[in-house]
Structures are given as structure tokens and as C-alpha cells.
Amino acid sequence: MATKGIYYTLVTQLDKLARHNRQGSFRTKDRYYEAVKRFCAYLAAHYHLQKLENVSGKHLVSYVLYLQEQGKSASTVKTDLSAIRFFHDKMSHPRYTLPGNEELGVALERRRFGQQDRTWTNSEFGKLIGRAMAEEREEYILALYLARYAGLRIHECFRMDTAAAERALRENALTVKGKGGKVRIVPIEDDRITMMLERLLDKTERGHKLLVPDGVPTDRAINGMQQFIIRHRDTICDPTAPDRRITFHGLRHTYAAEKYTSLVSGGMTPLDAHFTVSRLLGHERPDVTDIYLASVKGGSVRGE
């Protein structure tokens, strides 16, 4: 069944649940319905899931990461999760019990659009690399390098297979298929990426994913990376900033800020630098890129 057909099938199931719902105000009902309708579109496009009763924790984790990539606030993400659980509770025979927010293993941190500095310090990054080395997690080391020095999203890192890695080494550039199937080219500008690509290629069977062990679902491998950061976060973050909560996605912010600063320092105009960073990140909307450049004064396309 085509994605569009699957989507309509899921919405039909949602409509049946909604018709029998007598709880909540009209506003809440509408808000929850629209939230789960968007979730249906995601399930159809990314999982080809045909029954809402088969929704599980892995779908929630994946969807949360997707919403965060879209720049959605923590309150919006939490409301959407509440909506999904609300309708899940209305199902007669759900296959799985959905985990709570604390059990997802994904940080639902507070975000203030275009204001919050989410970049990592060199010390924080170096310490986490050290932890990954100590635990011999070479796949985590490569993922961290790809995010920090090439701006890749976490799912873009874990999607990489041997063919993509070989092409990157040949061309000295990463060909990245991002959200919506949009392809972008990101030059490899740090030798450590090349080094780790070569090391993992030597250990990975041809045709397999570089950062995902055989037999392990990709979403579980991604969750493992998230948990690794959460586990070590308190020991690597600045102790004078107890509320600081670094995330993998913050490395993308670090890449954007450092790239923008480097381009402007090299003589490029702020406007041109902004659009260059936007293209490298795989974004088209200036306001979204502004979020990534929150730590850089003048990083806005408007020159604010």
C-alpha cells in the first residue's frame, strides 16, 4: 500500500476512536486529534505502519527526535505525546504498553526559539570523546565527530552504510539524505572523520550500517547514543552551570556556530554566511537557521 493510502487507513482508525471520545473540552479534543493525525502521517511515511494498535515505544522515540529536529518546543512535544497516549488508552487491544516520558531515554529539554545557546564547549566534547574511547565505542566517536564537524543529525549518522562511507572517502565529502529525502553535500573538513570512517569500514561487512551492530534496530542504536550522553552528562558539563543539559543535537548547533564564525572571519558577509550554513544544515527557512546560530551575535539573516 502506498504511503498516502496507509495514512488514510490510520486516520480512519483514529476517527473511529475520536467518535467515541467524550472526555476533554472541544479545544483539547481538537488539539489532540490534530496531533495524532500528524503522528499518523509520520508513521505512514517512516514506518508504513498500518495499525495504530501496533504503535510502540520505538515509534515514540523516533517521533520525538523528529519533532525536535523540526524545532518544536518541549511543551509541544509533551502535548503531542499526551495526545498519542490519550488515544492509545482508548484502543480495545493495543499490542504494546507505551513508555512514559521518563522512560523514553530522550531529553525533552526546555527550548526557547532563537535564544538558547545549545552549543557544546571544547571541554565537554573532549571529555565525552574520552568516555567513548574508554568504553571502546568507536561508533559513538564517529557519530560525535560527524555531528560536531559536519553538522549531521543523529539519524543521518546512524543511517550511514559502507557504500556511503566509501563514497565519502573517495569524494572527501558526505552525501547526506536528510529530512524529506533532501540530499545535501557536506565537505569533510576534519581528518578525524576520515580516520574513523576508515577504521569502521575495516570492521563492517559490506552493505551493512557502520554505526549499527548487526541484529540491532536502528532506533535502538540511536537511543543507546542518547543514553550514553545522558549517563555522562553530569560529569562532563560545567559544574558551575547545574541546569545545563547538553544533547547530541547541540553538536549540530556547535557546528553551525563555528562554521558561521569561520566564514565571516574569512571575509564572507553575514548574509552569505547565513545562507551557506543553512544549506550545509539542510534547512531552507532562515528562522530555523537562526535557532542554530543563537550563540553567535549577528547570526540572524536579518543581522540582529
Region spans (language model):
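N-terminal DNA-binding module of tyrosine recombinases/phage integrases
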Residues: M1-Q23
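N-terminal core-binding DNA-recognition domain of tyrosine recombinases/integrases
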Residues: D15-D30, E34-Q115
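DNA breakage-rejoining catalytic core of tyrosine-based enzymes
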Residues: R110-K127, G181-D191, E205-H208
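Basic, Lys/Arg- and aromatic-enriched nucleic-acid-binding interface segment
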Residues: E124-I154
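C-terminal catalytic core of tyrosine-transesterase DNA break-rejoin enzymes
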Residues: Y145, G250-D287
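Catalytic-site neighborhood detector that most strongly recognizes the C-terminal catalytic loop/helix
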Residues: G180, R279-E304
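Active-site/catalytic core of tyrosine-dependent DNA strand-transfer enzymes
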Residues: E189-R245, H249-Y255, T261-S262
